[in-house]
């Protein structure tokens, strides 16, 4: 008998979990979006593993270090744990193909729209991509989902992209709305 596969809710960080106010690397600059904890709790109750997939070009551009990113990530995960919410893992891509410095100036399959982070999570957590969802605030997140075979793609409307031209399955205003949409769809 084969082991059953998990389904995941892949979350972009900046713009989905927190307010995207530019390159964020300090806890004092990190503001959670309204409803994030309740939405993540509801998604866990629906059986989704929570996996964060985030481009962090600020590292590649020399604006902050990988150590700064990890310190902020540890702080963020502690906030989730305080709310009794488990995030399976945070994957990040520090590269930028044009504006990266040194080792960070390169193409990477991990940098969205590449599917590398999604595929690493798939392999690490036995994830069935055909039952999984990605939520992002940019079309590059949606494209990463397509490239990684993620069945459902949800765009949180932001300032960057035109929702009318998105390849997302649905466009919503927040992660809370995304999880509510998933819940309604599953209970239909």
Where are these regions (language model features)?
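Active-site neighborhood of HAD-like aspartate-dependent phosphohydrolases
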Residues: 2-51
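Gly/Ser/Thr-rich helix-start
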Residues: 16, 59, 63, 137, ...
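Short, solvent-exposed loop/turn segments at secondary-structure junctions
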Residues: 25, 58-63, 100, 142
């Amino acid at each position: 008998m084969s082991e059953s596969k998990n389904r995941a809710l892949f979350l972009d960080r900046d713009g989905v979990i927190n307010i995207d106010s530019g390159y964020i690397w300090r806890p004092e600059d990190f503001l959670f979006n309204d409803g994030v904890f309740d939405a993540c709790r509801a998604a866990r109750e629906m059986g989704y593993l929570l996996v964060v997939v985030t481009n962090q070009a600020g590292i590649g551009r020399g604006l902050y270090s990988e150590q700064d990113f990890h310190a902020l990530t540890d702080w963020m995960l502690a906030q989730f744990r305080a709310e009794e919410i488990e995030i399976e893992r945070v994957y990040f891509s520090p590269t930028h193909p044009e504006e990266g410095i040194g080792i960070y100036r390169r193409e990477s399959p991990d940098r969205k729209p590449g599917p590398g982070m999604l595929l690493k999570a798939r392999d690490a957590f036995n994830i069935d991509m055909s039952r999984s969802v990605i939520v992002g605030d940019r079309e590059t997140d949606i494209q990463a989902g397509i490239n990684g075979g993620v069945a459902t793609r949800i765009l949180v409307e932001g300032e960057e992209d035109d929702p009318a031209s998105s390849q997302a399955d649905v466009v919503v205003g927040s992660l809370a709305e995304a999880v509510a949409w998933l819940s309604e769809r599953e209970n239909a």
